[in-house]
């Protein structure tokens, strides 16, 4: 019974992942006791469920309470569509039987808070200092910074040598400063009206520019490369994946575990731009596969001028297109930075 309830909650819209409260909670008859020929009189009955909390006997009330803590909090999981039962089992063992897949001590929480302050502080400064300038800020998506921090640290601790990032304009300036390590003074100079570009280089707007740096992690130094990006949304994806493939070949990385791509998307472009479907379809092929990609979709619930899901796509979630390659999908409430970091840790594992 508990496993059935858990499986249904995996794929239903019951997690608290909408910080704006715009999505209506759907009624799911499958999750009602009566649907399974049970009543409140059965809540004290005990059941032993294989691979759930070490198969110990629990009351139905405790089983449901545990599953609700897992599947109705700030993290939502979609993995029951995956054909490989080992992957499904890994997720179930990882997330069920405890309120959250990870817990943080006070030092870790303080670090997450500091990164949020860094992210929000930059946006507030740019908004007040350059009020009329285009900057495509990260307001509302500040959790992206500690999320990327976690990906870099956790991949580095596992021996990854290079991370190649691709993203569009939204939040790019924040990532350049707070993740990539670009000097704030360089960015502020680019905002200045009297800024003169280097005549030996072609000009471009500041939210298109790439950057590279080396970041020290617990596993050693990791090279970060953020690809330059035009205004054509998602077109950078195959460029980043091609760069990763070349770097793997150069390193003789046949296991494809030394260079990892991280692609960041907007909700509307991820579900609508054809190049996304192309890179997904080619991702498992021998010629073009790179061993896996971390896709991060920052969903601000408005695609350009389209705010209603019914006008933007035909699927329930913008990430549903990734199901065609059996990719696990983790939804997270952007107002919960700790949950965002947990999602990053799950992605690395």
What would you call each of these model-derived segments?
Residues 1-6:
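Single conserved hydrophobic/aromatic residue that forms the stacking wall/gate
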Residues 79-120:
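Low-complexity, highly charged intrinsically disordered N-terminal segments
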Residues 9-10:
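Active-site loops and adjacent core secondary-structure elements that bind or stabilize anionic groups
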Residues 15-21, 25:
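Segments forming glycine/polar-rich beta-alpha architectures that bind adenosine-containing cofactors
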Residues 29-47, 106-110, 190-215:
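N-terminal structural subdomain of ketosynthase/condensing enzymes
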Residues 340-349:
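Structural signature of the thiamine diphosphate
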Residues 121, 125-185:
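Active-site pocket-lining segments that scaffold enzyme catalytic pockets across diverse folds
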Residues 161-334:
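Cofactor-binding active-site loop characterized by glycine-rich and histidine/acidic residues
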């Amino acid at each position: 019974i508990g496993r059935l309830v858990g499986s249904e909650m995996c794929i239903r819209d019951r997690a608290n992942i909408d910080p704006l409260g715009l999505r209506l909670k759907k009624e799911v008859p499958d999750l009602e006791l009566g649907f399974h020929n049970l009543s409140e009189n059965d809540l004290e009955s005990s059941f032993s469920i294989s691979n759930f909390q070490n198969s110990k006997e629990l009351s139905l009330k405790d089983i449901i309470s545990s599953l609700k803590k897992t599947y109705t909090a700030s993290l939502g999981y979609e993995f029951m569509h995956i054909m490989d039962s080992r992957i499904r089992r890994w997720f179930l063992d990882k997330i069920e039987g405890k309120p959250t897949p990870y817990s943080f001590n006070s030092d870790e929480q303080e670090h997450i808070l500091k990164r949020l302050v860094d992210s929000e502080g930059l946006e507030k400064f740019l908004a007040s200092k350059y009020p009329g300038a285009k900057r495509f800020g990260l307001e509302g998506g500040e959790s992206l910074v500690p999320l990327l921090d976690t990906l870099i640290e956790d991949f580095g601790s596992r021996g990854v040598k290079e991370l190649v990032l691709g993203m569009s304009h939204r939040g790019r300036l924040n990532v350049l400063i707070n993740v990539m390590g670009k000097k704030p003074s360089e960015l502020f100079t680019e905002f200045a009206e009297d800024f003169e570009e280097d005549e030996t280089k072609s000009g471009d707007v500041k939210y298109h520019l790439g950057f590279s740096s080396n970041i020290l992690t617990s596993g050693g130094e990791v090279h970060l490369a953020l690809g330059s990006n035009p205004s054509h949304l998602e077109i950078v994806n195959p460029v980043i994946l091609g760069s990763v493939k070349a770097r793997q070949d150069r390193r003789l990385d046949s296991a494809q575990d030394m260079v990892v791509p991280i692609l960041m998307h907007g909700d509307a472009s991820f579900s609508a731009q054809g190049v996304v479907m192309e890179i997904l379809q080619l991702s498992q092929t021998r010629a073009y596969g790179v061993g896996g990609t971390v896709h991060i979709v920052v969903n601000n619930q408005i695609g350009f001028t389209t705010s209603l899901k019914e006008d933007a796509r035909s699927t329930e979630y913008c990430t549903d297109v990734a199901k065609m390659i059996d990719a696990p999908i983790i939804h997270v409430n952007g107002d919960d930075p700790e949950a965002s970091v947990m999602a990053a840790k799950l992605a690395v594992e």
